[in-house]
Amino acid sequence: MDISPAEISGILKSQIENFGVEAEVSDVGQVLSVGDGIARVYGLDSVQAGELVEFNGGIKGMALNLEKDNVGVVIFGEDRSIKEGDTVKRTSEIVAAPVGKALLGRVVNALGEPIDGKGPLKDVAARSQVDVKAPGIIPRKSVHEPMMTGIKAIDGMIPVGRGQRELIIGDRQTGKTAICIDTILNQKPTNDAAKSDKDKLFCVYVAIGQKRSTVAQVVKVLEERGALDYTIVVSATASESAPLQYLAPFTGCTMGEWFRDNGMHALIIYDDLSKQAVAYRQMSLLLRRPPGREAYPGDVFYLHSRLLERAAKLNDDNGNGSLTALPVIETQANDVSAYIPTNVISITDGQIFLETDLFNSGIRPAVNVGLSVSRVGSAAQTKAMKKVAGSMKGELAQYREMAAFAKFGSDLDAATQRLLNRGARLTELLKQPQYSPLLMEEQVVIIYAGTRGYLDKVALKDVTRYEKELLVHMRGAKKELLAKLREKKELTSEIEDEIKKALDDFTSKFA
């Protein structure tokens, strides 16, 4: 092939013009020391706080301490393969997680990567930063719609509304997780009947520092009962590093916020935040931040407040969505005045206090009605529930007070005897087995029977049987009445007359 000298310069010019500088410029540093999930890195002068960095072998970490001569990085995963002198690379990304409906029915880790063996996530809507600012005051609206848990004691006396933060607090083995799982299961009938996604309630369950077997059991229950279809499970188990246990609640919250910001409703459960605080304490002490009370760092209050403030009910201009939070805190020997419990009690809009003594005496769910409170109150109840359950909390409080005195005296007047009689039956009526949440209209009928004296003549040992048989009767012969109550959501005089008639008929036949 002959090329004339005149063409040579033209060919060289075109080659030079097409020459690309493919070299990648990245900001790198070196590992000075590593241990206990923390790496000290030299270099990375322009790294941001909370930025994701990458070690050799693809292990990720987050820059938390920005000091004069080094950067403290917490490592997401095993630190065994990281050695002194290794290169660390900036990614210029703040820690983010995948969001959207593609995550429903999946189990993911604290970084949003699937760990359920069902393959990679498909059609992820976006990736969102995990630690963002909570909505301000103007975009919010006061809580006014009920978020039904399906548990009579809670929906009747300590109602939770959409957009509320209600703390579940108690010692180990008092049924805290059981309440959370029942709440998720209770959304199934509503979600199945929903015409659009805006009528559904999507759930996010964040397991922090729990045993793998416990998380597997929860997932199994949700799957068997068809509740995993509208639930995302985020898991950072006890065997995972402290940074991942610290991060998991933020990742879960971001996934829940996507529903809230797109005009839908979501519920997030943090099980439990005590373990997140312990993980954060471990990280902070290893990063040599000064310890405060109980050796927790000074900003442990801010850790939980910025997380829980992201649960909100948005107003009409912002799509009307909501994110409801049920944080769980484990106490030691019922000590509610420890540092983390008092912090979270002061951040949330009420607490459900579970007691070992009640649990052991067979009152389950073991809710202490005296210490539990919802600061939203009856605004988060349907009109029907407000009407039938309004007096119940007061009656039970009076009953407990009287029961304490009744131990001393045997000759009680008729009114006191009536009060004790009614209180004992209400306490019995509020017991509920696990995995059997009730619909709002069923609860209204049962509580109506209790507070309006239909049980006063029923023997105490027969109360549970009365309730079971009443439910069968209502779901069978009276299902139109339940449907009417579900639709109207209030106790009109016509519906009340029908309930009275149904209860009169049933009670007269009950034996």
From Swiss-Prot:
Its EC number is 7.1.2.2. GO terms for molecular function: ADP binding; ATP binding; proton-transporting ATP synthase activity, rotational mechanism. The keyword Transmembrane helix does not apply. Produces ATP from ADP in the presence of a proton gradient across the membrane. The alpha chain is a regulatory subunit. It comes from the Bacteria. SUPFAM superfamilies: C-terminal domain of alpha and beta subunits of F1 ATP synthase, N-terminal domain of alpha and beta subunits of F1 ATP synthase, P-loop containing nucleoside triphosphate hydrolases. ATP binds at G170, D171, R172, Q173, T174, G175, K176, T177. This is ATP synthase subunit alpha. InterPro entries: ATP_synth_asu-like_sf, ATP_synth_asu_C, ATP_synth_asu_C_sf, ATP_synth_F1_a_nt-bd_dom, ATP_synth_F1_asu, ATPase_a/bsu_AS, ATPase_F1/V1/A1_a/bsu_N, ATPase_F1/V1/A1_a/bsu_N_sf. Belongs to the ATPase alpha/beta chains family. F-type ATPases have 2 components, CF(1) - the catalytic core - and CF(0) - the membrane proton channel. CF(1) has five subunits: alpha(3), beta(3), gamma(1), delta(1), epsilon(1). CF(0) has three main subunits: a(1), b(2) and c(9-12). The alpha and beta chains form an alternating ring which encloses part of the gamma chain. CF(1) is attached to CF(0) by a central stalk formed by the gamma and epsilon chains, while a peripheral stalk is formed by the delta and b chains. It is found in: Cell inner membrane. It is a peripheral membrane protein. The keyword Ribosomal protein does not apply. It comes from Hyphomonas neptunium (strain ATCC 15444). It catalyses: ATP + H2O + 4 H(+)(in) = ADP + phosphate + 5 H(+)(out). The gene is atpA. GO terms for cellular component: plasma membrane; proton-transporting ATP synthase complex. The record marks S372 as: Required for activity. Keywords: ATP synthesis, ATP-binding, Cell inner membrane, Cell membrane, CF(1), Hydrogen ion transport, Ion transport, Membrane, Nucleotide-binding, Translocase, Transport.
